[in-house]
Amino acid sequence: LKKVNVSLRPIVSNINLPTVIKTAVLPGDTMESIFVATQVGEIFYIRNRIARLFLDIRQRIIELGTNGGYDERGLLGLAFHPNFYYNGLFYLHYSKAGTQGQGALSGSFHPNPCEPETLSLRWVNRNTQYDHIDTVEEWILQPSGQSQRRRTLLNLRRPFLNHNGVNNLNFSPETGRLVLTTGDGGSGYDPFNLSQNMMEIAGKIIEIDVNTDILINNLPAVTRFNELPEAVQRTLTVIVKGTRNIPGIAFQRYNNQYIKYVGNVGQDLVESVFSFTYYKPIPVTEIISASTQNRSLNEDGLVNLGWRGWEGDLPTPIINPCLSNPSLVEETIAYYNEAISVATKRILPLTCYYHMDPRPDKFSGTALTGIQPYMGSEIPDLTGCIVFIDFVRRGSTPARGVLAYTKVRTECKLNDYSIIEPNYNFGTQSAYYVSLGANLTQSRLYLGVYGSSNVTDFNQGTVFEIV
């Protein structure tokens, strides 16, 4: 794959950290507007390079940056109903104000194969030992132009502050359902192995039938599917497990089907992009029924990304400096038994890139923060390709994110990828690549850049169009 050169055209600047970039046609309007959600809780819509406030829910968002400025909570998801133009419905995912807890573990977690008890921890006392509560809500844009919350779809109790997913609400053009992409709940190495446990909500991609109009007041905050009211259980199906942290799901029309793209943010070594076409959703009611009857669940057709046994294309490693030479590192398999157990159940990544990569035409990355297919024609070298971004190139000073791309999978092997070089001068300012969005036809791509890794360093965001 060859290196591709692009330009970046600024659309809006001096905003807070952009977590979601999408387009939609407002009711009564004739053209798409660009919508940008910020982590702190604002949603703007942009037309003719003028940003107007669509919604401000900053008072509803948990206090961010209390750990030094970096945070993975906040307003993380925004999706517009397929019939938004007619019904005004849209959906939000955010971390709720006033729900700060103490966390599920007092310290950091590191698995150690020589200490088997570290490989089988359980999340106990969940009602008190959690970090925060995330909510998924349905809102409606009223004819007056004001938006109002209609109902809560889910309240999720999260064990740690990180790995909540980002850009984590998207509608499936195949099923018309709302797709929630959740991370494994955080810390590191998935301490409680939530992502492989089918009863756990964490670490899954879930489809929600929003057309079943269920209104339940005071919906409980839950961690497992069987804690949900039965009426809510009936609206949910699981399509993917084994996620670690995930920047949304994207759909690419290909012949008469859709290819789905999802990414797993890596632990210490591997960032992965996955693609799949076929899947068989498993109703949550079936998961609960199998558990209640103590029978094994038929997971045929369920997509498994392999985490925590696998980090992309490698068994999840623990990286330590060599005792004899601290400038070198050794990689130890963290969860050997889990890796061989999941090996035949997982799908293989479409492409991977690494935190340490000496190859001259590659880069050493940090965290995958967005994936979008590009179906436009203005950048012909990228037409039909899958574009992805990394938060920050390792060792770059000042900090610079990375744009890259790969192609649709045609062979049963790991795809190569190549770097996209943006012709833009950020000067001495840091440029962390935090979000990647597209318009409705995927003919335009939008890049969210932030001047700091800390959400509480306010108003350092720019959204660009990639041209």
Language-model-detected regions and their locations in the chain:
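Beta-strand-rich domains and repeat architectures in extracellular enzymes and scaffolds
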Residues: P10-G41, G365-M375
